[in-house]
Amino acid sequence: MKYENIGSRLLMAASLVCGGKTVCDVGCDHGKLSLYLVKSGKAEKIIATDINKMPLQKAIDLFAEHNISDKAQFYLTDGLQGLSETDDITHVVICGLGGDTIAQIIHNAPFIKENGVQLVLLPAQSGDKVRQFLYENGYTITAEHTVGENKKFYTAISAQYTGETVQHNTYDCYIGKTENCTGADAKGYFEMVLTRHEKKAKGLQIDTGSCPEDITEAIEKVKKLIQSN
């Protein structure tokens, strides 16, 4: 396997890792992103975790195949559990998990706040839950990028704890800084968000006879983003 062949999603996540000394890849799956980060010079060392034994072993085998096992530590654990004493982590990367799960992993790891760890997050779904958690718990979103892969669209989020909470609405939770993104992937992402909200609005109209202004405003703003792309 060529380490470069990791797909557009993981490449986008990797692009947000800057100056990584020790990068923790949570839910590392088969270790492809971890390997790429080391091989490309984006990480000096990797801590790879997974809750399942088989994918973690695949990651171990992949690093051995490339003769860089000395560049990584592997942990069979849930999220970041057991890593609180590892105070040299500079980045935590979480890709491919649901938004609620990502939020819970961050919540359960206070060292992220204490040590100024950079977060790189790419939820498989429910990105709104990730943004909401970050807004309400003092994390500042520093960058977001949209990315498409296999006809699905995602957002990659870079964030760091500052202690500053952010007032937010439906639009902020579902769009965030992606409103600054342009191109085909951005348009695909915005269209996905619009479809979901129009469906939600229709359901609310049927069930309650009305739709909250917050949602209708979000729909109109997203339509404008699509038109500009």
Predicted feature locations:
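Class I S-adenosyl-L-methionine
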Residues: 2-6, 91, 100-229
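Conserved alpha-helix/loop element of class I SAM-dependent methyltransferases that forms part
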Residues: 4-20
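Conserved class I S-adenosyl-L-methionine
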Residues: 20-29
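Glycine-rich SAM-binding Motif I of class I
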Residues: 31, 35
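Conserved SAM-binding motif I beta-strand of class I
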Residues: 45-50
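Conserved SAM/SAH-binding beta-strand->alpha-helix loop
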Residues: 52-54
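S-adenosyl-L-methionine
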Residues: 60-86
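Short SAM/SAH-binding signature in class I
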Residues: 88-96
